[in-house]
Amino acid sequence: MTLSTEESIEMFGDINLTLGMLNKEDIVNKEDIYSHLTSVIQNTDILDDAIVQRLIYYASKDMRDNNMLREIRMLAGEVLVSLAAHDFNSVMYEVQSNFRILELPDEFVVLALAELATSYVSQSIPFMMMTLLTMQTMLRLAEDERMKGTFCIALEKFSKAIYKYVNHWRDFPYPRLDANRLSDKIFMLFWYIMEKWAPLASPMQTLSIVKAHGPTVSLLLHREDFRGYALGQVPWLLNQYKDKEIDFHVTQSLKQILTAAVLYDIGLPRSLRRSIFINLLQQICRAPEPPVKENEMKASSCFLILAHSNPGELMEFFDEQVRSNNEAIRVGILTLLRLAVNADEPRLRDHIISIERTVKIVMGDLSTKVRNSVLLLIQTMCEKSYIEAREGWPLIDYVFSQFATLNRNLEKPVKTNFHENEKEEESVRETSLEVLKTLDPLVIGMPQVLWPRILTFVVPAEYTEALEPLFSIIRILIMAEEKKQHSAKESTALVVSTGAVKLPSPQQLLARLLVISMPASLGELRGAGAIGLLKILPEIIHPKLVDLWKTRLPELLQPLEGKNISTVLWETMLLQLLKESLWKISDVAWTIQLTQDFKQQMGSYSNNSTEKKFLWKALGTTLACCQDSDFVNSQIKEFLTAPNQLGDQRQGITSILGYCAENHLDIVLKVLKTFQNQEKFFMNRCKSLFSGKKSLTKTDVMVIYGAVALHAPKKQLLSRLNQDIISQVLSLHGQCSQVLGMSVMNKDMDLQMSFTRSITEIGIAVQDAEDQGFQFSYKEMLIGYMLDFIRDEPLDSLASPIRWKALIAIRYLSKLKPQLSLQDHLNILEENIRRLLPLPPLENLKSEGQTDKDKEHIQFLYERSMDALGKLLKTMMWDNVNAEDCQEMFNLLQMWLVSQKEWERERAFQITAKVLTNDIEAPENFKIGSLLGLLAPHSCDTLPTIRQAAASSTIGLFYIKGIHLEVERLQGLQEGLESDDVQVQIKISSKIAKIVSKFIPNEEILMFLEEMLDGLESLNPTCTKACGIWMITVLKQQGAALEDQLLEILGTIYHHMPVLRQKEESFQFILEAISQIASFHMDTVVVNLLQKPLPFDRDTKTLWKALAEKPASSGKLLQALIDKLETELEDDIARVEAISVACAMYEVISMGTSVTGLYPELFTLLLKLVSCTLGQKMLTCPWSHRRHVMQQGEQQQIPDPCRLSTATLKCLQAQAMREGLAKESDEGDNLWTLLSSPSTHHIGVCSLARSMAVWQHGVILDIMEQLLSSLTSSSENYRITGAAFFSELMKEPILWKHGNLRNVLILMDQSAWDSNATLRQMAIRGLGNTASGAPHKVKKHKQLMLESIIRGLYHLARTEVVCESLKALKKILELLTDRDVSFYFKEIVLQTRTFFEDEQDDVRLTAIFLFEDLAPLTGRRWKIFFAEEIKKSLISFLLHLWDPNPKIGVACRDVLMVCIPFLGLQELYGVLDRLLDQDLPRARDFYRQFCVKLAKKNQEILWILHTHSFTFFTSTWEVIRSAAVKLTDAVVLNLTSQYVELLDREQLTTRLQALRQDPCISVQRAAEAALQTLLRRCKETSIPL
C-alpha cells in the first residue's frame, strides 16, 4: 500500500511512539502493541532502515524472553517474520545468530526459521544448508516434548520449501543449487525422528510427526536411494489412523505422498496399495461414527489419485468390497465411483463394463442409502456417457423401478417405523425422479439403450409422477431421429429390438396419453407433455391418424401456449379429438379394444381426480362411436348391474351413459327401462343405505336420466322428453318420497340433490334444443319443487348445497317457454333473496364446521350459492325486454344494498356485480341514473369486497347500455380499491367518477342526483364523501346541459337541505353542488334562490355564501344579481324582489367577494334601492306561507325593506374600504342610521358621498354617470338622494376635471327651485360646493347660481334651506367681485340681516359670516347703504358677543372689526381688542367702555342701539336678555342730556321692572342696575320719572 508523504510522516511517528513503549517494561500492553505493529508492517511498502533495525531488535529480544507470556512471544515472532519483507538478510542474521551449533535454541527461534522458510522460500534456500546442519546437531539435545514438536514443525516446513525448490528451481532467481545435499540433511533428520522419537512418541508428538511425514516423504521420493526407506515409512503413517483428531492429518500426509508418487511416476508396491485402499475406504465408510467431513473429502481425493494411477486394480478392489452386505461400504464405494466418473478420468473409461457390473451387484440391495447412491451414480454415468449399449438398459430400468418402489414398499408398512420408512422411500423416489429429469437421451449410446423400451413405462399407473421427464425423453428421441432422417440420405432409424420387454399396445398408449393430457388445462407440464407426445406418435397409434392429427393437434396445443384454459373446454376438445380419431380409424375391433383399455385404467386414478372423470367420459364417448350395437348394449347392462367397477358408481355410470346417449339414445333409454323393471328399487335402495351394498338406487337412476337428456341428440330429445325422461324422473322422485302412501325421508339431501341435478340438466337440454315452439308443460311444477327445497333450508346455517343447486335449476327452467309473468318473476326472486341474503356472516357460518375441511366446504357452498343467485337474477332480468320490468326486479336488491349490516351489503353488491356484466345488453329504455347513484358511492364502503363489487357494478351499468369505457385503466383503478387507506379509496372513486360521468344520459342526471342525495343522508361517512364527490364530478361534467331539468334539480336539493344540515360534510357537498350548477346556469340559480321568502332562512343564506365562495363564479354571481336588481328598479320603485336581491347581495359580499370591477354599478343600485325603500313597509308577506319556530312570547319581526337595503350597502362599503375603493365615513356607524331614516337620509347620503375615495376618480366618475339619472327621477326620494350625493362631489376639483358636472350643475339649479325643501337644500349645497370644486364655473354661471341661492333665503319655513343658502352664498361670494354682486347686493344684505336672531345656531353663525363677507363687496354704490345696515345690525353683533354658542361670539367680534370702518369709528378698535384676550371682559365693563367711546364719536349710533334694544329684552336666551339690559344700562349712562330727554322713560322703566322678575338672576341684577342708572340720569337732567 503506497502512502502519501503526510501519511508516511504520521505513520513513522506512530511507529517511533510504539517503539518507545516497547522499551518500557510494561508487559500488559505489549500484546496489543505487537498486534498493531504486525498490521502496520504488513500494510506498508517502505519502512525506514533505522526503524526496521530497532523493530528487529525489540521483536527478537521479546521473542526469546522466557519471562514474557507465550502469546506475546508468538506475536513478537510474527513481527520479526513480517519484517523480513523489508530486510530479509537482517532478520535472517538476527535469527541465525541465536541458532548455534550444539546449543539447544529457543523454541520461537526455530519456529521463526520455519516460518521464514515457507513465507520466503526463494530467500531462505541459500541459508537452508547451514540451518539444517545446525539443526542436525540439536536433535540429540532435545528432550522436552514441546521442543521435539517444534523441530518436527521445522522439518515439515523446511521439507515443503525444499520440495518446492526441487520441482520449480527454474523459477528461482539464482543459479541452481545442489538439492541432493539438502535432501541428504532432511533424510538424516527424518531418519533420526522416525527411529528415535516416533516409537516412543506421545499423542501430541505423534501428531507433529504425522504433519511432517507427508512433506518429508514427498521430498525424499525424488531420490531413488531414499525411495525405499521413504515408502517403508508409509505403513507407520497408515497405522496412525486411530483418532478423529489425527485422522485428517494422516490422510492429508497420505495425499501428499500419493501426489508425489504420481509426479515422480513411482509405482507403489501392491501390498502397500491394498493397505492404502483398505485404510482410505475405512475412513470413508467408518462406523459407527460418521467420518469427519474434511477427512472424508481428503480420502476421496486420494482415491481419485489412485483411480488415475491404478484404475484396474482399484476397480478390482471395489468389486471385491461391494460384494459384502455392509451398507456403509457399499454407499462409500458407490460415492467414490460417482466421484471418479464425474472426474472424467480417461483411463477409467476402459473399465466401463466393470463399473456397470459393480452397480448391478448392489441393485438388489433394499437399503435406502444404497439405492440413492446407485441412482446418483447412474445419473452421473448417463451424463458422462458411461452407459454401454448392451448392458445399460438394466440401469435405466432400475431408475424407473425405484420410482415405482415407493407405492409397493408402503403397501405393507411396518407399524413401528412407518413414517420413517415413508420419508426414506420418498427420498429414493425424489432421487430417481431427479435422475430422470437430468437424463440426456442423446448422449452417445443412450438412444440405443432407451428406444423403444422406454415406452413400457408410459402406461403403468405407478409411473404417473415420472411421466413429465419420461415424455420429454421420448419426444427428444423421436424428434432427433426425425431430424436425422431429414438430413441423412440413409435412414438411421431407432433400433426397434425390445428383447424381453413387452411394449404397450396402440390402444393402451392412446388411452393413457389422452387421460394424462387432461391436467394440461391446469398448467401441469405432464399433461402438456402427453398431448405433445401424441402429436409425434400418430404412426405408432394408427397410420390413419397421421393426417388428422397433423392438423388437429397443433390447433389443440394452441390454447395451452403460455396460459391455462377452462377445464371444461379442454375436456371437450380432447373428447372431440377422440371422436374424430375413432371415426377416422373406423375399426370396430380397434374401438372395442380401446373400450377395454379404458376400463382397465379405472383403478389407476382416484374418483375425484380430473383424470378419472375424463376417463368415464372418454369411455362413454368411445361407446358412442362404437358401431356394434350389441357390444354397446352389453356394456351398458354390465355397468348398470355392476357399477362398482367404475369407482364412484353414480358419477361413473352417469358420465358413461350420458356420453353414450349422444349416438345411442334409443339403446340407453331401452336398457334403462328394462333395468328399472327388473330391479326391486325399494329394497335395493334400502340395501344400499343400510347394508353398504354398492348397487344403483332410484336416486342414481334419476341422475342418469338427467345426463342422458343433456347429451341426447337435440332432434330426438324433445319427442321423448315428457314420456321417457321427465315422467320417469318424477315417478322415481315420488317413489323415493312416499312408500305405501306415506311420506318418508322427505328431507333426504341426496334425493333432493339428485332430483335437482336431473331437473337442471333436463332444463339445459331443452334450452339447447332451441325449439322456439316447444312448450315445457312441467315448468311451473318443477320451479315449485325447487322453491320448496329452498324454503325448507334453515336461515341460520349453510350446511347443504340444496340452495345452490335449486337456484341453478330455477335459472335454467325460467328460460323455457311458456314465459312467466312479471309478478311470478318478482315472487321467485324475492323468495330466493330473502332466503340467502339474511344468512349470518360467513365467519359465523364457517364456525359451525368442526374441521378445516368443513369450514372450506361451507365457504364453497356460500360462494356457489351467491353466484347462483346472481346468475338467476341476471337471467330473469335481462331475458325481459321491458325496461320497467327489469327495473322492478332490480329494485328487489335496493334495500339490501343499503343495509346497515355490512355482510348483507356485501352479498347484495356481489350479486349486483354478477348481474351487471359486460356481456349483457339492457333494454333500450333501461335507466341507469338511479342505479348509478345507488351503487357508485359504495366504492368507498367498509369492506374491500363491497368496494370491488360496487366499482364493477358501476362500470357494468355503462356496458349494458352499450357504452364502452377505458377498460384497462378502470381495471387498474378497481384493483386499487383493495387498499384499506380511506384516502386512496376516495381518490380512486373520484378518478372512476371522472371517467364515467360524462357518459351518464343527460335525462337521467336528476334520478342520479336524487339517489346521491339520499346517500348523503343515510350512508356511512366514507360512502357519504364518495356520494358528494360523485355528485360534484357529474355536475362538473354535465352541468352545462342540465338547463331543462334545473328547477327540478334545485328543488330536490332544497328538499334535502334541512336533513343534511345536521351532517356537516354532507351539507358542504350540497353547497358545492349548488355552486357547480351555478357555474353553468348562474342566472337560473339566482332567480330560483331569489324566490325564497324574506327574511332568508339559514339554509338560503348559506347557499348564497357558498355560491360566493368560489372565486371563479363570485363575479358572475354578483353580475347576475346586479342585472336582476337593475331590472327590478327600472321604474324607480322598489318591490319585494329587489329587496330579495339586496339580501342576496349582502350574503355574497359578506363572504369577501371582490367588488372592484362591479363597485360603481353595485353602489348606485343599492343606493337607489335604499332611496326607493325609505319609509316603505313590506308590500306583501311572502313569509306568511312558511312556518317559523318561535320562542314563547317572541313576536315575529316584519322586515324593514330600507334597513335590509342599507345593511347590504353597508356591507358593500366595508368591502370597498378593504379594497381601497372608499374610506371611513366621518359619521362612523351612525351613517347607516342616518341613511335609513327618511328625515336624515340626505345627511347620510352626503356623509356617504364624502366617504368616496377621491383618488379612485375613475370609480367615482362611473358612479356619477350611473347616478346622474337620479336628478331627474320620478321618485322624489331618489332625486333627493342624487342631489345630496352630487352636492358633496361638486366640491372635488378632480371630478370637475375628469367628469361632466356641468349638466349636474344645471340640474342642481333646477332642483333649487323644487317644492321639496330637502331637495332644494341639497341642490343649493351643491351649487355652493361648486365654488370649491370649480371656481371658474361660479363666475360663468353666477347669475343662475345667485338667483337660485338667494331664492333659498326666502324659504323661511325651513331653516335648513336658509342655512344652506347662506353657506352657499358665502362660498360663492368669496369668488365674486363687487361688480359681479352689485345687482344682488342689497337683497342679499337685507335677507342676511333677518337671520341674525334665528334660533338655529348654524343659521345665525352663517348669516354673521356672510355679512362679514359682504363688506368687501359694497363698492361705491352700496357703501352708504351697507353703513346704514351696519347701524341697524350693530346691536345684534354686540349682544351676540356673549352668544351661547362661542363660535357666534367670535364671529360677532370679527364682523365688528370689519364693520367699524364703515361707521368711521376706528377709535373703537382699542375696546374691541380686549375681546381678543384669553379671558373675555365682563359684559357690563365692555359695554360701558364701548359706549363711552361711541358717545364721544357718534351719539346717533348710541341712540340707535337704544331704540333696537327693547326687542332683545324678550329673547329666549338668558345671556342675550342680560346683555341687552347691560347694553341699555351703558347706553343710558353715556347718552347726552338731549337724548336722555328723548327717552321713553315710562316704557323703559316698565320693561326693566318686568325684567327684575326674570327667572335668571343675572337678568334681574342687570335690570336693577339699569333702573338705578336710569333713575340717576333722570335726576341729573331733572327729568321726573
UniProtKB/Swiss-Prot annotation:
Q: Where are the HEAT repeats?
A: 28-65, 228-263, 272-309, 310-346, 405-445, 531-569, 572-611, 662-699, 777-819, 964-1001, 1021-1059, 1112-1151, 1157-1195, 1258-1295, 1363-1402
Q: Show which residues constitute the signal peptide.
A: none
Question: Keywords in UniProt for this one?
Answer: Cell projection, Cilium, Cytoplasm, Cytoplasmic vesicle, Differentiation, Flagellum, Repeat, Spermatogenesis
User: GO cellular component annotations, sorted alphabetically?
Assistant: acrosomal vesicle; cytoplasm; sperm flagellum; sperm midpiece
Give the location in the cell.
Cytoplasm; Cytoplasmic vesicle, Secretory vesicle, Acrosome; Cell projection, Cilium, Flagellum
Free-text description of this protein's post-translational modifications in UniProt: Constitutively phosphorylated on serine and threonine residues in acrosomal region of the sperm head, midpiece and flagellar regions of noncapacitated spermatozoa. Phosphorylation on tyrosine residues increases upon sperm capacitation within the acrosomal and tail regions in a protein kinase A (PKA)-dependent signaling pathway.
Which BP terms does GO give this entry? cell differentiation; protein kinase A signaling; spermatogenesis
Subunit structure, briefly?
Found in a complex at least composed of MROH2B, PRKACA isoform 2 and TCP11. Interacts with PRKACA. Interacts with TCP11.
Protein role: May play a role in the process of sperm capacitation.
UniProt name for this protein = Maestro heat-like repeat-containing protein family member 2B
**Organism encoding this protein:** Homo sapiens (Human)
**Lineage, top ranks:** Eukaryota, Metazoa, Chordata, Craniata, Vertebrata
Gene from which the chain derives:
MROH2B
